[in-house]
């Protein structure tokens, strides 16, 4: 009886492992369905990086890359917008057709993140979770002591903490580890903490406690960076919901699911009369193509290299 039971358990374990391998292969194949093309020179107003499909058609990073949520493995897709240690504030455009990655601007000038001593640029690979949306048309209930907040009208942000510096526009399968509810200019702006599934430490980390074991201090450092990073631009310190505590991976998965449902409402067109500044929802399917016109990157202004002591 014990031998039969052991054989059954072994067989089940092998089946689970085969399923994991199959899902991983399918995920890799899905990622190979996409590529990118670039127009203009990086660090200029004309720079755009577009998603393209296998047939050369232009798609949307925001809407055409699948969320690909696996609740058992706690994995999703991530679009890399800003590689670690770089300063350009690149993001998926909400206004332009097909939502290319562009550099954010303010008053017609390109935006760069300030260097908060002792760091240079963004302290993590920074990006977005596709097919999610933080809904600005409704107030979201948070902790018992928190005021309900509206979403920031963007896809969910994520911070990848692995060892590699990732490439802008790349699509990565990442493991969800937790999240931090940033309050930015009175809006809810979740920061989801993830790690690339191909990182050597990914198999050892599945929640906040393991992050502290393998990356001691990184959660506190991340919170302090997000608290202070706008101060050099004359903004006040940012604050956080839930008494500044990170939410665990299970709660974060629920947040991702809610934001995926919000995204479904967005692309349905049912919210057009509720909000004036909704993101562009044009997706692949009409055969639109563009020429790749890569140009060498322009020089970063020297003042961007300045360190700020906050």
Swiss-Prot record:
GO molecular function terms noted in the UniProt entry: inorganic diphosphate phosphatase activity; magnesium ion binding
Range annotated as the organelle transit peptide: 1-30
Mitochondrion recorded as keyword: yes
Record-linked InterPro entries: Pyrophosphatase, Pyrophosphatase_sf
Binding site for Mg(2+) 2: 157
Magnesium recorded as keyword: yes
Cofactor needs: Mg(2+)
Binding site for Mg(2+) 1: 152, 157, 189
GO terms under biological process: aerobic respiration; phosphate-containing compound metabolic process
Locations listed in the record: Mitochondrion
Disulfide linkage: none
Note: Present with 195 molecules/cell in log phase SD medium.
Subunit structure: Homodimer that binds non-covalently to a protein complex in the inner mitochondrial membrane.
The protein's name: Inorganic pyrophosphatase, mitochondrial
Source organism per UniProt: Saccharomyces cerevisiae (strain ATCC 204508 / S288c)
């Amino acid at each position: 009886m014990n031998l039969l039971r052991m054989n059954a358990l072994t067989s089940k374990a092998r089946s689970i492992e085969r399923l994991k391998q199959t899902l991983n292969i399918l995920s890799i194949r899905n990622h190979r369905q996409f590529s990118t093309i670039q127009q203009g020179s990086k660090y200029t107003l004309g720079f755009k990086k577009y998603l393209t499909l296998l047939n050369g058609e232009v798609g949307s990073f925001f809407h055409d890359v699948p969320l690909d949520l696996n609740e058992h493995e706690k994995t999703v897709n991530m679009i890399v917008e800003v590689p670690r240690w770089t300063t350009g504030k690149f993001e998926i455009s909400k206004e332009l057709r097909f939502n290319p990655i562009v550099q954010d601007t303010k008053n017609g000038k390109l935006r760069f993140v300030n260097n908060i001593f002792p760091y240079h640029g963004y302290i993590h690979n920074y990006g977005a979770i596709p097919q999610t949306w933080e809904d600005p048309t409704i107030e979201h209930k948070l902790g018992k002591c928190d005021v309900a907040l509206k979403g920031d009208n963007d896809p969910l942000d994520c911070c990848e903490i692995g060892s590699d510096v990732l490439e802008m526009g790349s699509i990565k399968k990442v493991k969800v580890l937790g999240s931090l509810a940033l309050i930015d200019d009175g809006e809810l702006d979740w920061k989801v903490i993830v790690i690339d599934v191909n990182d050597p430490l990914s198999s050892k980390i599945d929640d906040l406690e393991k992050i502290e074991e393998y990356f001691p201090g990184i959660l506190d450092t991340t919170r302090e960076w997000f608290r202070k990073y706008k101060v050099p631009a004359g903004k006040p310190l940012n604050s956080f919901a839930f008494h500044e505590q990170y939410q665990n991976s299970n709660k974060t998965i629920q947040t991702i699911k809610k934001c995926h449902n919000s995204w479904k409402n967005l692309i349905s067109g049912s919210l057009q009369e509720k909000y004036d500044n909704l993101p562009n929802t044009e997706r692949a399917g009409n055969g639109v193509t563009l020429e790749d016109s890569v140009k060498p990157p322009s020089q970063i202004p020297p003042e961007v290299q300045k360190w700020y002591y906050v």
